[in-house]
C-alpha cells in the first residue's frame, strides 16, 4: 500500500514538473517574441494600402488586412509588445507596491497597520474594473494611465498576503533571536523577512498575469488604454468592432491572441501553485 501511494506521488510530481517546463517554455517564448516583435513582422504594421483594405486571409496576408489595408498578422505580432510588456509591468508594480505596504503593516503594526488595512478594505469593497474605469476616466486615455488605474486598485490583495506572512515570520523564535541580536530593521526585512514571504506573493503574481492582461485589454477596448494607431490587442478589437459582421477576421485575430496568451499564463500560474503545494511533493 505504501508503495502504491509512493508511486502515485511520484507520478503526480513528474506530471507537475512536466507541465511546469512546458508552460514555462511557452510563456518565455511568448515574452521573447513580444520583445523582438519588430523583427518578426512580415510587413510594416503601420503601412497602409487602401487597395487591399478589409481583404480576407490570403497566402500573402494569412490573417487578412484591416480597414486601412494594414497586414493583420504584422499588427497582431507588433501588438504583443504593448499588450504583454504592459501586463508584466503592471504585475511588477502591484506586486512591489502591495508587498511593501504589507510588510510595513505586518512589521510596524499599530496605527500604521490599522490605517493602511482600512484603506485596502475600501479598495477591496469596490468592484475592481469599475474603480479602474473611474480612475482611467479621470486621468484620461493612454496605456500609461490604464496601468496606473489598474495598479491603484490591485495592490490590496498583495498587501494582505505580505502582511499575514510577515506577521507569521515575526512571531517565530528565530526571528525574535535575530531582533535581539541588534540587527537593523532594514537588514532584517531584506535578509530575513522578504526571502521567506516572497513565495506566496510570486505565486499570486503569476496567477494574476492573465487577469491583468484581460483587464488592460478591456480598458483599451473601451477607449481608455492604448490609442490607435499603436498596435495593442484591446485597442485593435475596439477599432474593428464595427466590422465584426462584415470582416470578422479583423476582430478575431487580436481576440485569439489575447485568449492564447491568457491561457498560457493562467496554466503556468496554476502549475506553479501546484508545484509550490507541499501535497504535490508527497
Spans of features found by a protein language model:
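N-terminal signal-anchor/first transmembrane alpha helix
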Residues: 1-43, 119, 197
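Hydrophobic alpha-helical transmembrane segments of membrane transport/permease proteins
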Residues: 31-68, 222-230
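Generic hydrophobic transmembrane alpha-helix motif, especially the helices
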Residues: 62, 66, 97-98, 106-168, ...
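Glycine-rich helix-loop "coupling/hinge" segments at transmembrane-helix boundaries
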Residues: 136-138, 150, 165-166, 214-257
Amino acid at each position: 500500500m505504501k508503495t502504491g501511494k509512493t508511486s502515485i506521488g511520484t507520478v503526480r510530481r513528474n506530471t507537475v514538473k512536466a507541465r511546469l517546463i512546458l508552460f514555462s517554455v511557452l510563456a518565455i517564448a511568448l515574452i521573447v517574441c513580444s520583445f523582438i516583435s519588430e523583427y518578426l513582422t512580415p510587413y510594416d504594421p503601420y503601412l497602409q494600402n487602401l487597395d487591399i483594405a478589409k481583404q480576407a486571409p490570403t497566402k500573402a496576408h494569412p490573417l487578412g488586412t484591416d480597414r486601412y489595408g494594414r497586414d493583420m498578422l504584422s499588427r497582431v505580432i507588433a501588438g504583443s509588445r504593448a499588450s504583454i510588456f504592459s501586463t508584466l509591468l503592471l504585475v511588477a508594480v502591484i506586486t512591489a507596491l502591495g508587498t511593501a505596504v504589507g510588510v510595513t503593516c505586518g512589521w510596524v503594526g499599530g496605527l500604521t497597520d490599522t490605517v493602511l488595512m482600512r484603506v485596502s478594505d475600501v479598495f477591496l469593497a469596490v468592484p475592481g474594473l469599475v474603480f479602474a474605469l473611474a480612475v482611467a476616466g479621470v486621468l484620461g486615455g493612454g496605456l500609461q494611465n490604464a496601468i496606473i488605474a489598474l495598479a491603484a486598485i490591485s495592490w490590496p490583495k498583495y498587501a494582505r498576503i505580505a502582511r499575514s506572512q510577515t506577521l507569521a515570520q515575526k512571531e517565530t523564535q528565530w526571528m525574535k533571536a535575530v531582533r535581539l541580536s541588534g540587527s537593523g530593521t532594514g537588514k532584517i526585512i531584506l535578509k530575513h523577512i522578504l526571502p521567506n514571504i516572497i513565495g506566496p506573493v510570486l505565486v499570486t503574481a503569476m496567477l494574476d498575469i492573465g487577469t491583468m492582461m484581460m483587464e488592460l485589454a478591456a480598458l483599451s477596448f473601451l477607449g481608455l488604454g492604448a490609442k490607435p494607431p499603436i498596435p495593442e490587442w484591446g485597442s485593435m478589437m475596439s477599432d474593428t468592432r464595427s466590422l465584426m459582421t462584415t470582416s470578422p477576421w479583423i476582430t478575431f485575430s487580436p481576440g485569439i491572441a489575447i485568449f492564447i496568451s491568457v491561457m498560457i499564463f493562467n496554466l503556468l500560474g496554476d502549475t506553479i501553485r501546484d508545484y509550490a503545494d507541499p501535497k504535490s511533493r508527497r
